[in-house]
Amino acid sequence: MYPAHLLVLLAVCVSLLGASAIPPLPLNLVQFTYLIQCANKGSRASYHYADYGCYCGAGGSGTPVDELDRCCKIHDDCYGEAEKMGCYPKLTMYNYYCGTEGPYCNTKTDCQRYVCACDLQAAKCFARSPYNNKNYNIDTSKRCK
C-alpha cells in the first residue's frame, strides 16, 4: 500500500471517531412540524415558533412572555416528564394523522403515546394562541430572567 493511501485511511478513521461523539439530531422534529401545520391549517409556518419568546426553541428560562410562549413551556415540561418515564422525546417517532378535525395520534407504545400527546397539545395550543411579532427573536438575556 502506498503511503498516501495510508494517510487517507488514517484521516477517514480519525474523522469517524470524531463523528461518533456528535449527538443525534431530534428525529421527531419533522413530525412535530407537521402536527403544527395541521393544527393551524397552514396559517403560519412552523419555523416561526423556533425562536419565539423565552421557551419556544432551544432551552428556556424565566417567565413566558405570553400565551404562545406558555404553550412552549408546557411542551418543554411535558418532554421533561417523558424523560422521567424513561422516554427520549426528541428521538421518539410516532404515528399521527391530519384529519378534517385536525391532527391526532395513533401510536402503540407508552412512550410514543406520551410524546405524541405532548406534541399534539403544543400544536393545538399554538393554533389557538395569538402570535405577537414583537416576541419573535427577542433578547432572552434581558427578557427571560
Curated annotation (Swiss-Prot):
Keyword Secreted carried by entry: yes
One GO cellular component term noted in the UniProt record for this chain: extracellular region
Active-site residues annotated for this sequence: H75, D119
Cofactor note: Binds 1 Ca(2+) ion.
The EC number(s) this enzyme carries: 3.1.1.4
Compartment(s) of residence: Secreted
Cysteine-cysteine disulfides: C38-C98, C54-C144, C56-C72, C71-C125, C78-C118, C87-C111, C105-C116
A GO BP entry: phospholipid metabolic process
CDD domains in alphabetical order: PLA2c
InterPro entries on file: PLipase_A2, PLipase_A2_Asp_AS, PLipase_A2_dom, PLipase_A2_dom_sf, PLipase_A2_His_AS
Signal peptide, first to last residue: 1-21
Positions with a binding annotation for Ca(2+): Y55, G57, G59, D76
One Pfam family linked to the record: Phospholip_A2_1
Keyword vocabulary terms for this entry: Calcium, Disulfide bond, Hydrolase, Lipid degradation, Lipid metabolism, Metal-binding, Secreted, Signal
Function: PLA2 catalyzes the calcium-dependent hydrolysis of the 2-acyl groups in 3-sn-phosphoglycerides.
Protein family (similarity comment): Belongs to the phospholipase A2 family. Group I subfamily. D49 sub-subfamily.
Name by which UniProt lists this protein: Basic phospholipase A2 cPt10
Native species: Laticauda semifasciata
Lineage: Eukaryota, Metazoa, Chordata, Craniata, Vertebrata
